[in-house]
Amino acid sequence: MVRRSFVMLAALIALALASLISTAPAQAAGNAKVYVVHGIPGRDLGLQPSLPVDVSVNGACALTRFKYTDTVGPIELPAGSYDIKIHLSASLSTPPCSGPVAVAATVPFASGENATIVAHLTDSGAPTASKFMNDVTPASVGNGRIMARHTAPLPPVDLIVKTFSSPATLAVIPNLANGQQVSAELPVNTRFRIQFALAGTTDPVRVGSVKARPGETVIYHAVGSVRKNTFTLIELRVQQ
């Protein structure tokens, strides 16, 4: 996992987005498969709640009004570096990518990797972007692969796994810090309850639900603030 921090929020989101936009052949051998998740609520930073941005890549406007909780991917991306510019989204009547340029950057990706870039907040509430490798290892028969990523402005948490039909705890994943992820197998087509509790406690600060699916890695990103009521789980489904 690689983390980059940026001064401007729009810059960090767009840096992730711009990495994904390409006119490369869809099935070229050796390409990287890249996804991106917008996990920063503007409300947490006193900005427009959906925090839309536009992205130009190699001089062309490639993505417009990408908003909080949106996802993009997979994009087949040949190994190499991509020149991008990030624009703050203006009004709908304004041409795309005509807003102020927040940043210009060159972003590399390696051949053959399967990755997600997540724009999110650190445990102290500062904007950042983290690159995670996606675990696409096939699960055993009858199971599916679930990944959970701590990308919310919270200190380390314990993930407590339960079913909806019983109060019994099935598993506890302790001390997961902001910017970290875990991968596990769960029976497919069964919804499980995931409680987020501050590390060493049992009282959940938030509760979500997850569901494993055959042939996919289902990734859940915890994003947003509990204090400002923007906390949510963003689901991303990656083919194995």
What are these regions (language model features)?
Residues M1-A10:
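Bacterial N-terminal signal peptides that target proteins for export
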Residues A10-S19:
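Bacterial N-terminal signal peptides
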Residues T23-Q240:
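Intrinsically disordered, low-complexity polar regions and short flexible loop motifs
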